[in-house]
Amino acid sequence: LSKLFHQNEKITHQRFKALTEETLTRFHNPKALENLQKSKLTPSAVLIPIILQPEPKILLTKRPEKLKDHAGQISFPGGKIDSLDKDPIETAIRETYEEVGIKRDDIKVIGNLDVYITGTGYRIMPIVSIIDTINSFKLSINEVEEIFFLPISYLLNDKNHYKESASYSKNGIKFDYDYYVIPYRDYKIWGATAGMLMNLYDILKGKIQ
């Protein structure tokens, strides 16, 4: 699996900023690009934990309904990069332990996806990892309401995701955009989480089937 992803042993904070600029240049709307470049994007990192046993599946969390931001949404473990974190990998691993109790020694980082930029002003480094098996978790009740697992086989089935359209205004500019939705059981995975999962899908599709 590690050969499929960007290798991130040397992703310093400076390299993260450079990768963000590379991602920004992919925007086709010049006004949107200009607006994003002027705004202060908050550096963040998430862990995409792939649990190998008994079948490959991705750990996801549901945020508590009482939260002020992103209440009830589905997300990966992760958060803002702390000034004491040496790199985005450190952030992703630290946040994962704090949120769901997975220990550092159980996590094997195998690479990263492209930087993901959100409409709410975050630049996210998705760190891909594999975990052989996990028998117990310790959830932070203030950050995580529950966890569940999305089988990779489900993600790779084209029938299990689709696009929706929406629009919003920021600084007087209207943005029209499409976003992915991945319905799974009683969960609706959308927004940045679904976007990063679809980036993972693009890499894995045809490689492990």
Task: Give the location of each predicted region.
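N-terminal leader/linker segments that precede catalytic domains of diphosphate-processing enzymes
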Residues: 1-73, 80-98, 102-112, 116-134, ...
